[in-house]
């Protein structure tokens, strides 16, 4: 089995004296693990940081066994964010969420595009936290657990949608949800429209929303918690006053 594909590095760990096992999110083939010869070397290791954009040439003798990959870096990757530790935390958290949520060797082009959009936004400090929420919503969508924010689940109206049912992932209008608001999840307006700026608390509400469904539908059934990198990101965003 052989293919060449655009990819993002999700994780890498040393293997043997000089090699590395690398988790890749590829554009057309999904999440793949591969052995990279020399991946632990000073020359190659900088290209294998979480979030790095690469071209991967994958080869395996048997399709269901671990293959090898030759990696060619594309652009600066995480190095462009070295002066922004918070953005680097966002990139690491996104890589950890994707690595934990996506099944191996199953195409998920929507997840790749959502990750790509986030990496493009990370140099814009006022924008990327909201794009991170959209990335997680896109990941849920691509895995079959998309939020239905098109209309109120109770009445069918499309205006004044301010909550989401934690059970179904469907939007609820202010009037219909008022009696049950303590049991509903807040719906930040930026998930409904790209128009307008962020309000205080919108990013926190968005992360609580996507985090709930990632935990309920993806990580929980696998008996795994949300990745520590995501929890650290919330702490750092809070410390920076960015929630």
From Swiss-Prot:
User: Tell me, which GO biological process terms does this entry list?
Assistant: DNA recombination; double-strand break repair
SUPFAM superfamilies membership: ArfGap/RecO-like zinc finger, Nucleic acid-binding proteins
* Gene Ontology cellular component annotations, sorted alphabetically: bacterial nucleoid
Q: Has UniProt tagged this entry with the keyword DNA repair?
A: yes
- What superkingdom heads the lineage? Bacteria
Q: Which UniProt keywords apply?
A: DNA damage, DNA recombination, DNA repair
Signal peptide: which range, if any? none
The record, for PANTHER family, names: DNA REPAIR PROTEIN RECO (PTHR33991:SF1)
Which HAMAP family does the annotation name? RecO
Q: What does this protein do?
A: Involved in DNA repair and RecF pathway recombination.
> Record's family?
Belongs to the RecO family.
What protein am I looking at? DNA repair protein RecO
The encoding gene is: recO
